[in-house]
Amino acid sequence: MDKLLIKASKPLQGSVRISGAKNAALPILMSSILADTTCYFDNVPELRDINTSLALLAELGADAKRVSGHAVEIDPSSINNCNASYDLVKTMRASILVLGPLLAKYGEANVSLPGGCAIGARPVNLHLQGLEKMGAKIDVEAGYIRAKVDGRLKGANIFMDMVSVGATENLMMAACLADGETVLENAAREPEIVDLANCLNAMGAKVTHAGSDKIRIQGVERLQGCRYAVLPDRIETGTFLIAAAVTGGKIRCENAAPETLDAVLDKLVMAGAVITTGDDWIELDMQGHPLTSVNIKTAPHPGFPTDMQAQFVALNCVAQGTGVVTENIFENRFMHVPELQRMGAKIDLETNSAVCHGVSSLKGAQVMATDLRASASLVIAGLVAEGETVVDRIYHLDRGYEHIETKLNGLGANIQRIK
């Protein structure tokens, strides 16, 4: 099993190209199920979860392949079964996103209950309740969701009890081929939702007001394939910016989307960084500026993203003062804290908050990644820890970061992938 061996880094310097967003690419790949003809997707990152998605689409019968580095081609016309098996779905929570498209296009779907990161209860009931409002008959038995509909799904007014990115995506896709108008209230507002809506519209869908909490979808009879480029990954961008900040460096993130990172950039400025942005780039300069701890409260977009919480815990560990990081989205999302404590971090856990008391230095240690973003926080800590840090179970990292050690080494880090 691969590990990362990290040695203390000089201040990171230089420029790094940001990959396409995993959290946008996954639903966009699944949306191809809705089309009658071939879809061509660009800026698709090379990640384990993307490979799992392509394998899942192939299992359904689609011709799904990566044709070059970041280009993916999917011909859905050969789909001949509606069964998403446990073997693939167990490794990736986003597999649930085949449910809505299969049901809308083919009238049935049998999807194993999903896996993914073990960061608390993330129930699929909102997905199922919404599809039932659109006329689906759904049973959950033997670990599978079995859904059917007679004829087309019907447009409906759907109010979601809580904000859910996955449910918003699944229902938005299903509604594109429904009969009539669907209104999603209390919808998620993340940039990845907007990106999916733009892709669906490029296929011929009629989705409006994505990015607001009330999305309208006028169903159409057919969708066609399209060419679409996935938006840049705001979480990868934020992770590199924090890595530069904790090392006292200066970096430029190219192929970025600054408008998707307002909450993160604001906190980095509060931490002492000088931030400059352009249309598709972000520059952070921490040279000569003391790193100051910040308070964070995660919230649905446009609030502070939960996927950046662990990285800011790592920042607070080596910043001046005390910073409180409060997790309001998921329970059980502080599994990185005991690992950071092994490196000498002073963190007190209080219910859903991590109280981080900055220390002058961390010490290298053997640590274990527990989920995707937690693993990123350990890499960040390793960059500034004295001695060597070994991060185990980095398959979590490979699910969401494209060639992270290569990119960081290009900025001056010293990281090796070892067995």
Curated annotation (Swiss-Prot):
Q: Does the keyword Metal-binding apply?
A: no
**Family annotation (SUPFAM superfamilies):** EPT/RTPC-like
What does the sequence similarity comment in the record state about its family? Belongs to the EPSP synthase family. MurA subfamily.
Which residues are involved in binding phosphoenolpyruvate?
22-23
The keyword Cell wall biogenesis/degradation belongs to this UniProt entry's keyword annotation: yes
Please state what the protein is called: UDP-N-acetylglucosamine 1-carboxyvinyltransferase
- State the Gene Ontology BP annotations: cell division; cell wall organization; peptidoglycan biosynthetic process; regulation of cell shape; UDP-N-acetylgalactosamine biosynthetic process
| Swiss-Prot/TrEMBL keywords | Cell cycle, Cell division, Cell shape, Cell wall biogenesis/degradation, Cytoplasm, Peptidoglycan synthesis, Pyruvate, Transferase
* Subcellular location field: Cytoplasm
- Tell me the residue numbers annotated for binding UDP-N-acetyl-alpha-D-glucosamine: 93, 307, 329
Question: Which is a Gene Ontology cellular component entry for this protein?
Answer: cytoplasm
Name the job this protein performs: Cell wall formation. Adds enolpyruvyl to UDP-N-acetylglucosamine.
> What EC number(s) is this enzyme filed under?
2.5.1.7
Give the active-site positions.
117
